[in-house]
């Protein structure tokens, strides 16, 4: 399908905002995914195109956070493998979902992601009833295995839809005993990039991406992701979260009205 200038500008700004939000607090898909639906992209194709478009922004955020990434390889590697495996599985599941079925799932997915985002700190608090061990060098293999299984489940959801996975990952890291939010943010963005990398490859191989729309959004998400990662510490996270939750609820209500 074609792309008009007005649509291109709209998608560029939507992806820029989404990339910034993903770096600041997560939840960027609450902006960029509905934006694709608003320009008449079919549901499954909109989701796959959105995933590919936002991935470069995640990579940009990951690079910006590298100085905070201090987790040992024995912890990171199993989590990365689980992320990639789950992301690919979730993406393949999405491609097998009929368009009309997915469109009926959209408001539920948006609402579920919004609630997960809204109560993410509570999830972290519940998961974090453990000894504080921001130094992960002495993490037991049992803890690493349990966290990897949890991350695999997060990644399947992430490959399928993905809104709210950041807080699920933060909850998993809290289970390991981490408390340094910036160190946790660095791992969160890395694992999200791994989840979406597997999904991106799956979608591209399956020819499930609208490239005119995707290319415009990649430019926006790159700029937004880099900006958000560098200015994350200056933003008031409570205000950012409030905006994201408000948008998520509004989008959920809009799509519920469309399908009911």
Regions found by a protein language model. Give the residues of each.
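Selected transmembrane alpha-helices and immediately adjacent juxtamembrane segments
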Residues: 1-42, 129-185, 215
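Residues within membrane-spanning alpha-helices of integral membrane proteins
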Residues: 8, 51, 106-110, 114, ...
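Membrane-interface alpha-helices at helix entry/exit sites of multi-pass transporters
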Residues: 41-51, 74-75, 178-189
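Selective hydrophobic functional segments
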Residues: 48-108, 196-246
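Transmembrane helix exit motif
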Residues: 60-70, 91, 108-136, 252-260
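Hydrophobic alpha-helical transmembrane segments in multi-pass integral membrane proteins
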Residues: 90, 151-160, 199-207, 214, ...
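Hydrophobic alpha-helical transmembrane segments of multi-pass integral membrane proteins
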Residues: 112, 186-199
